[in-house]
């Protein structure tokens, strides 16, 4: 079992133990969903399985998707349109207002999330999107 599957397994187990209605999944754009293009013109070359898996996650009632990006607002609008073309929607962008600060945790500058999908978190987009798709399809089959 690879790292991303372990992270989802752990998050879903905690969800059940704690009685939460959903988990929060933070997702980066560059070098995670799309291959980074260091030019002014974006190429929108997605990693294999990325868009298909994100569409599945969009439909999953137990997952709240948070887009995590440093993209400028005008470029972000282009990305959101591109995601919409693939029927992918993010519930939040760069934040999570559903989880307030507590006595122990301050979420003013770092949003609360259960699983992070980012190449800088160790996510391997060349392999992990496919593994994640099969994992999530298995969960959906169990719910039937």
Task: Give the predicted meaning of each segment.
Residues 1-144:
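HAD-like aspartate-dependent phosphatase fold
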């Amino acid at each position: 079992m690879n790292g991303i599957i372990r992270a989802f397994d752990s998050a879903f187990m905690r969800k059940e133990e704690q009685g939460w209605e959903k988990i929060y999944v933070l997702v980066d754009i560059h070098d995670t969903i799309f291959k980074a293009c260091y030019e002014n013109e974006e190429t929108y070359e997605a990693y294999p399985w990325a868009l298909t898996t994100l569409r599945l996650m969009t439909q999953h009632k137990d997952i709240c998707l948070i887009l995590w990006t440093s993209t400028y607002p005008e470029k972000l609008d282009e990305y959101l349109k591109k995601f919409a073309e693939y029927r992918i929607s993010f519930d939040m962008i760069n934040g999570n207002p559903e989880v307030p600060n507590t006595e122990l945790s301050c979420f003013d500058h770092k949003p609360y999330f259960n699983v992070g999908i980012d190449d800088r978190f160790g996510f391997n987009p060349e392999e992990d999107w496919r593994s994640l798709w099969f994992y999530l399809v298995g969960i959906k089959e169990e719910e039937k």
